[in-house]
Amino acid sequence: MKTSAQQLLSALLLPLSVLAAPTGSIEARACSDVTVIFARGTTETGTLGTVVGPPFLAALKSALGSSSVTMNGVDYPADVPGFLQGGDPAGSQTMATMVTSTLSSCPDTKLVISGYSQGGQLVHNAAKLLPAETTAKISSAVIFGDPDNGDPVQGVSADRTDIICHAGDNICQGGSLILLAHLTYGMDTTAAAAFVKKAAGL
């Protein structure tokens, strides 16, 4: 028989066990109208970075409604050696895998592939790793400060591709200098969100 102290402890711990219960299975079944797979730039922290990822997500939520968009960041080193290789190879594969798994679990979502700086390299690389029948399902591709500026995103038509490069951005010119022009793409996120919305037909 439980003592009153044991009963009290059980009563106190029960709410904690409910809070700690995994909710992933419920969340996994909830597919957004728009899903963005985003790769951050070199040396940025987290998976969304700071220069473009967060303001782009905010702009998308404003344009589409907070319940209609999900942004998933690519987990990769985002280091200088990866940039010099033309985009981290493992990160590029990770992004391609995320595209495949997202379309498998949420076939009706409007899938967007996006990246900033080295993240743009990952967008190009991931698209090349995917079969044509998969890239045909990508709603749009959006790249900010693209080191591969001028190159198409394989399998994504030009009218569904938005590559944003500022005048004076050395990275967009094929260089490796980080100048002010490369650090101000947050200002372009509202227009980019409008592009995503139009491409998705929403």
Curated annotation (Swiss-Prot):
The record's InterPro entries line, in alphabetical order, gives: AB_hydrolase_fold, Cutinase/axe, CUTINASE_1, CUTINASE_2, Cutinase_monf
Q: Which GO terms describe its cellular component?
A: extracellular region
Effect of loss of the gene: Decreases cellular carboxylic ester hydrolase activity. Does not affect penetration of the cuticle of gerbera flowers or tomato fruit.
Q: What class of enzyme is it?
A: hydrolase
Gene Ontology MF annotations: cutinase activity
Residues of the active site: 117 (nucleophile), 169, 182 (proton donor/acceptor)
Query: Which EC numbers characterise this protein's activity in its record?
Result: 3.1.1.74
Task: Look up the domain of life of the source.
Answer: Eukaryota
State its location(s): Secreted
| SMART domains xref list | Cutinase
The cysteines joined by S-S bonds are 31-106, 165-172
Fill in the PTM field for this protein: The 2 disulfide bonds play a critical role in holding the catalytic residues in juxta-position; reduction of the disulfide bridges results in the complete inactivation of the enzyme.
Keyword vocabulary terms for this entry: Disulfide bond, Hydrolase, Secreted, Serine esterase, Signal, Virulence
Tell me the leader sequence span.
1-20
Q: Which reaction does it catalyse?
A: cutin + H2O = cutin monomers
Is Cytoplasm one of the keywords UniProt gives this record? no
User: What Pfam families has UniProt attached to this entry?
Assistant: Cutinase
This chain's function reads: Catalyzes the hydrolysis of complex carboxylic polyesters found in the cell wall of plants. Degrades cutin, a macromolecule that forms the structure of the plant cuticle. Allows pathogenic fungi to penetrate through the cuticular barrier into the host plant during the initial stage of fungal infection.
Q: Which named protein is this? A: Cutinase
Q: Which species is the source of this protein?
A: Botryotinia fuckeliana
Q: What is the lineage of its organism?
A: Eukaryota, Fungi, Dikarya, Ascomycota, Pezizomycotina
